[in-house]
A protein has these predicted regions:
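Flexible, charged surface loops at secondary-structure boundaries
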Residues: 1-3, 139-147, 168-170, 425, ...
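Anion-coordinating catalytic cores for phosphoryl-, nucleotidyl-, and glycosidic chemistry
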Residues: 2-33, 42-47, 189-883
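Basic/charged alpha-beta structural segments of nucleotide/phosphate-handling enzymes
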Residues: 11-145, 154-159, 166, 181-182, ...
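Acidic/glycine-enriched edge-of-secondary-structure segments
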Residues: 110-130, 147-150, 201-215, 457-460
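Alpha-helical hinge/cap motifs
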Residues: 153-161, 421-424
């Protein structure tokens, strides 16, 4: 068996040579990169320092050493990566940093770091220059170890590796395979015995296209690839799509390739966060850096369900948590889990969750321990790599920049990647993206640590990025049989782009419209959009077209809320037990009532705002009501509310504020601490004003707060009635339930006073039913009379506390209740007839179901449908009043 060696520059070329060797049944063949070649020659299982080890040692050097100029870089994000990149350039250039150290303090600092790295390398590892020197010193056995050497795929050879190849040529035969395009780049081989074999240039079929945006370029590239495959002109492993740098197209490729199901291999790897292990690491980093929260912790631990520490947790453990609790601090989690542990029917989650949450709550300083204890396999590798690339405080950013190898086989797939890699294994069908003045060629930049005034760039980088882009362009062009040049008119932000100077002037460009109908679609969605007739016959298209037309019609249609009369789902929503809120929506927005109570639609969760700057009006009202309830209940049970003094009310209110603040921290999204304290003070003042409002005292008055009726849970423990008794609206089959803010009764339960506290802006005049928006007084009066037959008079009032507040008693309750019953009858008839149209409640700026309405409903939809709506609702329209 004859031993021979092939030296290649990239992993893509390694895959190709390995596949070719398998096809040829080759024996005794070694496929090596230059660093592997040096390690093989040096012997003793030596290898060049890896990227991860280099990052780790440079990070340690920054922590341990003292510097003249690099001291300020010690804690800066990206410092480790920048220093490693500079050191690699120095090593590639075959420069002796120790000899240059005396020139400037900057070079001295870098030489100090290099010495530290060299001294702390693990056994079996050497710096690149040292490894090459060791290999050259051990060339006597090169013929036996390597056999004949073939070098292929290189566009540029760094001086460090040139030294190795030139020395190796004296010990064994080297045959260098290249393309005629690179003849000038290989003049350094002429003094040696290296035999250079030039492959002649090909004359490719050249096409140039101009697209609208980078995303459009990706779409057209995938269409082109599918056309080549289905026409039989090319197979996937003969097709390459390249760019000088891939960042502007990567995300679009990832999404569109998944949609197209084309076999595409990402040469440069996939984004770590597009993989499951990357999501595990990223979600954990988010919790660690941004802090504990309900959403963040649940998401992270659900992704980590397979780690040993969480295997004892049931799969649905998170459903036991309160859905509205933000749980922003470790103490909140401890109290919440303590309450869950009191339920004997549920497992105790504390032994599993609390140690993990305590570790995560330590933040960035615990990053290494978090990765060690909570991650495994590739997720841990991603975590550790991100810690090497940057400080723990930037972990989420570092993870987002990482790439992991694509596990698909490039020998069976279309390849997408950077030109410098694809040029090492060019393909007959090539499409170049981004041929604009910005990308082909890219403009070179000075090294961040060794600019031109410190070290000549020609020494540090003999071939800059601009020269390399030109070389790679020529290599790909001259190696292809069919090549397409592609550029976009504008970038993703809309800026106009110039044409690359590398584009052949003799090739006329074809301008492609983004909305054009392609001959070959790259995916099913692309095909359907290209075939309008076929798309129009799909269920989704028919529904969309029908909705589009109906929303623009002056008549009311099914898309405006018209359904068959007697719909059982709507009937069930009507016959449910109602609150003042549901009846308000029934009267002011029948369509919203159906969405909310028949279909079960809900507005977005409040957890989407984990720490709002201010409480919204509804939440502030809940806070004030909680303060009123707890304070009044305490005072009533300690001598009676009617006999209390202002000092007693203030003292009880302070204690209630303390309890409620603790309770809300565990269950509600709250503003930052200082804003929350101010909100508590405002709510406390509002509650004090309400509790001290001068109201005439009833004889032998008893006060009840948060009084439930109709089967509603919670509220006052000592109700003056059966809390489960059915309350119905006379003349209707509507059942009521609710909670009265405050109920005062005299000793004989003959006279009653119902108070509904309001925390909004006080109106200038008596609001009445307010076009269906103020129903509480009338409904609560109905409930009190139904549940307490001895009651003769009910004073139902709205109380707006505060210096500019007022008390509004319901004028002529009998008339108001009769009017309410009448309009409720109209609303029920409208719903049962299938005419659930929008009302003034839908047009309100506070409509929390506005997301389900057409876009710009205020400007177009509501005015367009108003006339037809008004004609349909009849007398209900006069109750709504003027919008």
């Amino acid at each position: 068996m004859t031993r021979r060696t092939i030296v290649i520059p990239s992993r893509l070329a390694w895959h190709e040579e390995r596949f070719r060797a398998a096809q040829e049944n080759a024996l005794g063949l070694q496929i090596l990169t230059p660093s592997q070649l040096a390690g093989r020659l040096a012997g003793g299982f030596l290898e060049a320092v890896s990227q991860d080890i280099c990052h780790e040692l440079v990070r340690n050097a920054l922590a341990d050493l003292k510097f003249a100029e690099l001291e300020q870089l010690r804690e800066m994000p990206g410092a480790v990566k920048a220093i490693c990149a500079t050191l690699v350039k120095v090593w590639d250039a075959d420069m002796d940093l120790q000899a240059l150290a005396g020139r400037t303090p900057r070079l001295s600092d870098l030489a100090q770091i290099e010495s530290y790295v060299r001294d702390h390398l693990p056994g079996g590892m050497m710096l690149q220059r040292d490894l090459v020197s060791a290999a050259i010193a051990n060339l006597k056995n090169a013929g036996s170890v390597l056999g004949p050497v073939t070098v292929t795929g290189f566009s540029f050879v760094a001086p460090c590796w040139r030294r190795l190849f030139l020395a190796l040529a004296g010990s064994t035969s080297i045959e260098w395979h290249s393309i005629e395009t690179l003849r000038e780049q290989l003049t350094w081989t002429q003094p040696s015995s290296i035999g250079v074999v030039f492959k002649p240039k090909r004359t490719p079929t050249q096409t140039s296209v101009v697209c609208a945006t980078p995303k459009h370029e990706v779409v057209e590239a995938l269409r082109w690839a599918r056309q080549l495959i289905v026409s039989g002109r090319a197979r996937p492993h003969e097709i390459a799509i390249v760019a000088s740098s891939t960042e502007d197209w990567d995300e679009d490729f990832r999404v569109l390739v998944a949609d197209s199901q084309l076999p595409v291999h990402f040469v440069h790897g996939c984004s770590a966060t597009s993989t499951f292990p990357g999501q595990q690491a990223s979600s954990l980093a988010t919790v660690m850096l941004e802090g504990l929260s309900h959403d963040r912790v649940v998401r992270a631990l659900r992704l980590l369900h397979n780690i040993p520490k969480l295997k004892s947790l049931p799969g649905d453990w998170y459903t036991s948590l309160s859905p509205d609790a933000p749980l922003l601090k470790l103490r909140h989690w401890q109290i919440s889990l303590d309450k869950l542990a009191e339920d004997p029917e549920k497992p105790d989650f504390r032994p599993v969750l609390l140690p993990i949450l305590a570790l995560l709550s330590q933040g960035a300083p615990a990053a290494e321990q978090v990765g060690e204890e909570l991650l495994a396999g590739q997720a841990r590798a991603i975590w550790l790599r991100a810690l090497l690339d940057g400080p723990p405080q930037a972990l989420t950013t570092s993870i987002g920049r990482l790439r992991v190898p694509d596990e698909s086989d490039p020998n069976a797939n279309i390849i997408w990647g950077p030109a410098h890699t694809v040029a090492s294994a060019p393909r007959p069908f090539t499409r170049m993206l981004g041929l604009t003045s910005r990308h082909w060629p890219r403009q070179g930049r000075e090294d961040a640590l060794l600019p031109s005034h410190i070290l000549d760039p020609a020494l540090l980088e003999p071939a800059g990025v601009t020269m390399q882009d030109r070389i790679h362009f020529a290599m790909l062009r001259d190696a292809a049989g069919d090549i397409v040049y592609s550029r976009s008119r504008r970038d993703s932000e809309g800026r106009l782009l110039g044409t690359s100077p590398l584009l052949p002037s003799e090739v006329a460009a074809e301008h492609l419209q983004r909305s054009r109908i392609p001959q070959h679609a790259f995916s099913e969605s692309d095909r359907l959009l290209a075939r309008r007739q076929e798309f129009s016959e799909t269920e989704g298209a028919r529904s969309a077209i029908s909705c589009y037309r109906d929303w623009r019609s002056l008549n009311l249609t099914a898309h405006d809320g018209l359904v068959n009369s007697g719909d059982p789902v709507i009937e069930a929503a009507i016959t449910r037990t109602h609150s003042a809120t549901s009846l308000r929506q029934m009267l002011t927005d029948p369509l919203g009532f159906v969405w909310c109570y028949a279909l079960g639609w809900k507005p977005p969760s409040p957890l989407s705002l984990e720490e709002p700057l201010v409480l919204d009006k509804q939440t502030y009202g809940l806070l004030a009501h909680d303060l009123l309830r707890q304070t009044a209940a305490f005072l009533e049970s300690n001598g009676g509310f009617a006999a209390t003094t202002s000092m007693q009310i203030e003292s009880a209110l302070v204690e209630a504020t303390r309890r409620i603040a603790l309770e809300w921290e565990l269950t509600m999204p709250l503003p930052p601490t200082r804003l929350w304290q101010r909100t508590l003070t405002e709510a406390c003042n509002t509650a004090f004003s309400a509790l001290t409002w001068p109201l005439p005292e009833l004889k032998g008055q008893k006060t009840f707060v948060e009084v439930p009726f109709g089967g509603l849970e919670g509220g006052e423990d000592k109700c003056p009635w059966d809390r489960n008794a059915v309350v119905a609206v006379l003349g209707l089959d509507l059942k009521l339930r609710g909670k009265i803010d405050r109920l005062d009764l005299d000793s004989e339960s003959i006279n009653a006073r119902v108070i509904d506290y309001k925390t909004g802006r006080c109106p200038d005049e008596e609001p009445g039913l307010k076009n269906g928006q103020e129903l509480q007084r009338a409904l609560y009066a109905v409930a009190v009379k139904a549940l307490l037959p001895k009651v003769v008079t009910v004073d139902a009032a709205l109380l707006y506390p505060g210096p500019e507040g007022n008390l509004f008693s319901l004028p002529d309750p009998k008339v108001q209740i009769e009017e309410l019953i009448c309009v409720l009858q109209l609303a029920v008839q409208l719903l049962r007839s299938g005419q659930s149209v929008f009302g003034p409640g839908a047009e309100s700026r506070y409509n929390n179901l506005a997301f389900a309405l057409p876009a710009n409903a205020d400007g177009v939809y509501f005015p367009q449908k108003a006339a037809a709506r008004d004609a349909m609702v009849g007398n209900l329209r006069s109750f709504w009043g003027e919008n």
